[in-house]
Amino acid sequence: MSNDIISNMITSIRNAILSKTKTVDILATTTTRSIAKILLQEGFIDGLRERQENGRRLLLLTLHYERKNKSKITTSLRRISKPGLRVYSNHQEIPKVLGGIGIVILSTSKGIMVDREARHKKIGGEIICYVS
């Protein structure tokens, strides 16, 4: 494992989606918890639980592959800002994913949030990833 926890999280979710696995374990940190809560609120995952195993806190994400009640199916997760190349944007230049169907997750001075919320609050920040 590398030191980039966000990339590890995105890769784990992407691999679980490709193998049609129902659940995926991710190391629980403040950042991964915030991103997972956003994915849950936006309807890209079904469930989120925290558990402890061998002294490590883990997040158990429940994925879904069928549309239920206007929920979204995660087809693409892409890490944008990386430790070697940070990508920042002001609130006017935050990109739209699939014309607004997907979301952009940003790290701002007010915490981690989605693109719509950042535009509304007129806050820019570091673009963490695209989800569609």
Curated annotation (Swiss-Prot):
GO MF entry, a single one: rRNA binding
Main localization category: plastid
Cell location: Plastid, Chloroplast
Single GO cellular component term: ribonucleoprotein complex
InterPro entries: Ribosomal_uS8, Ribosomal_uS8_CS, Ribosomal_uS8_sf
GO biological process: translation
Keywords: Chloroplast, Plastid, Ribonucleoprotein, Ribosomal protein, RNA-binding, rRNA-binding
Record text on subunit structure and interactions: Part of the 30S ribosomal subunit.
Annotated family: Belongs to the universal ribosomal protein uS8 family.
Record PANTHER family: 40S RIBOSOMAL PROTEIN S15A
Protein's job: One of the primary rRNA binding proteins, it binds directly to 16S rRNA central domain where it helps coordinate assembly of the platform of the 30S subunit.
Protein name, UniProt field: Small ribosomal subunit protein uS8c
Organism: Spirogyra maxima
